[in-house]
Amino acid sequence: MQTTMMDVGLSLNGLLERAGRTFATQQIVSRLPDKSLRTHTYAQWHRRTRALASVLQRLGLQPGDVVATLCWNHHVHLEAYFGIPAAGGVMHTLNLRLPPGEIGAIAADAGDRFLIVDDILWPLAQQVMAQHRFERVIVFPFSGAPVPDGADDYESLLAGADPDGFSFVPHDEHAPVSMCHTSGTTGSAKGVVYSHRSTVLHALVGCMGDHWGLKNTDVLLPVAPMFHANAWGTPYGAVMCGTKLVFPGPHLHADDLLDLMQIEPPTLALGVPTIWLTMIQAYERALTEQPGRWTMPQGLRSLVGGAAVPESLIRAFDRHGVWLQQGWGMTETSPLATVSYPRVELQDAGADERYRRAAMAGVTVPLVDLRLCDDDGADVPHDGRSMGEIQVRGPFITGAYHGVGSPADKFTPDGWLRTGDVATLDDLGFLRITDRSKDLIKSGGEWISSVDLENALMSHPAVAEAAVIAIPDERWSERPLACLVLKPGAGFEPEAMREHLMAAGFAKWQCPDRYEIIDAIPRNSTGKFWKLKLRERFTR
């Protein structure tokens, strides 16, 4: 017997067309640099997106060509999410928080042809362009300022386009649609390329009730950057469901977000723990200093990821009627792989158990296979105590890296992705992250390479050896601590060291906040730095 089902490929183009037709009056709200709000309907967004695709084709974009974005969260970035693939291109989101040299290297690795950039990021773009040459640079006049000489005006290009005459580029469901870079165990950026198929499947899984639970009646506030694993895939889910979107633009300070919530109350928001920590601090401070300034949107759910969520933070928000829902994933997993949500087996559990479970990474989502393996590659028991490396596979899990392939340290012989994260699983399937086997530091949802920092520190004439470890931080989840062995007779000034690191290409936020001068760095039996001993010494 054979199936009678049609063989119709999955495509973002279908989501775009359906949204413009079915949800024509739904709103997309963007906060501009001056903090005013600009609103488009889905019908207007649909037409502008088709116009962008038409423009890109007219400029010579060929199937598979890469178009970079250097943008905050706003309607034009959403147009790029769908317009670039509609033209047959691959959208490559550039992380504007990285040093310019690193952004340029990432753009070169991807082979970016065109760049779409916010006008307020033009100074950064100029530094990036010194590292990588884009054939065309298209500036979105986000602030309304004149577009710089030598660049194309995004709005002028769209005004002269023919969205009605545009035709989608034929494609296979496995054709690439977007690309993000992630840091691997060596600290070097690696490209992950998503397909029409993987993106649609990820959005469908994400929209399930126990996960994002997106509905047409929801209002989504994506605080997580659209250059971070595509804002966790939620823009695709929002378009799929016709959800109202409220984009915060560049205004991510706690006060700004709380102000925005008074104007456009969300029912669902997402961001890294640092965002929610600073928000609850500002909110509770205002309760006594400025009573009545803000109210928390009742029933708001906040998706939190990118770093572990403290149970105390979940409790703090719950006191004000907001529930924090934790998930786990990575750029390589699109990123949603697990979500913590209420289970029927726990409906009679007390509050303490409910909070304890909420602080876990959660349960594996459908279509993702997850296993924990010990150092010998054997499965570990699901007893909530035995630890192993998380390994995953599935239709929206990457099987390789762009230009690198499938290195043995990242993929098992039987094709599973080795995440480098260490965890336990219990009998209900709840995942609890216990450690990371890699030495990367995750600060405010951003990766910092300890290896790169160590190399730069040891290039200073006063430093003989340097080892960098992550230490817990209430606000940023983790911050780098540098342990230094100085050369005989050498002095040390923290400010001078920070200037040295920034001159080497590090951003200010990537530099260590704390330095410890020690006599020697402990080593293991193979001569490698024994960072466990440093963590035991300095993180008590």
Residue spans of the language-model regions?
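Conserved pre-ATP/AMP-binding loop-to-beta segment of ANL
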Residues: 9, 24-26, 159-181, 188, ...
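Structural core segment of the AMP-binding/adenylate-forming
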Residues: 15, 58-59, 86-159, 488-490
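Conserved AMP-binding/adenylate-forming core of the ANL superfamily
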Residues: 28-74, 78-82, 99-104, 155-156
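Conserved AMP-binding A3 loop
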Residues: 39-43, 177-204, 530
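AMP-binding/adenylate-forming catalytic core of the ANL superfamily
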Residues: 98, 104, 115-119, 394, ...
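Conserved AMP-binding/adenylation subdomain of ANL enzymes
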Residues: 200-219, 229-268, 282-290
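Gly/Ser/Thr-rich phosphate-binding loop
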Residues: 240, 266-271, 280-355, 369, ...
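Conserved beta-loop-beta connector loops within the AMP-binding
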Residues: 363-391, 427-428, 490-494, 530
